[in-house]
């Protein structure tokens, strides 16, 4: 009869921790991927907005050049340019925030990967111990069988 491994419950806990660490690593990788996509989208939006802003400023200057314009209109023009600059700063701040989120997610992913590696190593240690224990248990069972066989030898006929 095969004996039950005495550390079986510890082994199952280690496997559970290993699986949980793998799931946490997958979640961290997914969050990192999403953060990188968001960063790329914000960077693209900023680049496109800057291109549009240059065209818009040029269009606004063309509308003013060669005409007599009241001072109020020039003030409104300058105010409009300031608003465009403020919008650019908002987009640049959003991009920087997205980059910070990517760095944070990279750190989380690195920690999750390290935790998963540690969990795998811990489970492997118990697996190795179980393998050694099974070999020892098998040898002990064979030794017990040999002892029983020696005790059971038939008496000699003389």
Residue spans for each PLM region:
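Charge-rich amphipathic alpha-helical interaction elements
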Residues: 1-158
């Amino acid at each position: 009869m095969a004996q039950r491994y005495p550390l079986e419950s510890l082994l199952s806990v280690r496997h559970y921790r290993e699986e949980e660490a793998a799931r946490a690593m997958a979640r961290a990788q997914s969050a990192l991927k999403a953060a990188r996509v968001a960063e790329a989208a914000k960077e693209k939006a900023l680049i496109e907005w800057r291109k549009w802003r240059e065209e818009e400023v040029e269009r606004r200057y063309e509308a003013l050049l060669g005409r007599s314009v009241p001072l109020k209109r020039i003030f409104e023009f300058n105010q409009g340019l300031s608003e465009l600059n403020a919008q650019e700063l908002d987009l640049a701040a959003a991009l920087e925030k997205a980059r910070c989120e990517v760095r944070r997610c990279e750190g989380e992913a690195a920690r999750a990967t390290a935790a998963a590696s540690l969990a795998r190593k811990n489970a492997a240690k118990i697996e190795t111990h179980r393998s050694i224990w099974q070999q020892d248990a098998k040898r002990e069972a064979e030794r017990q069988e040999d002892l029983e066989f020696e005790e059971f030898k038939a008496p000699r006929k003389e």
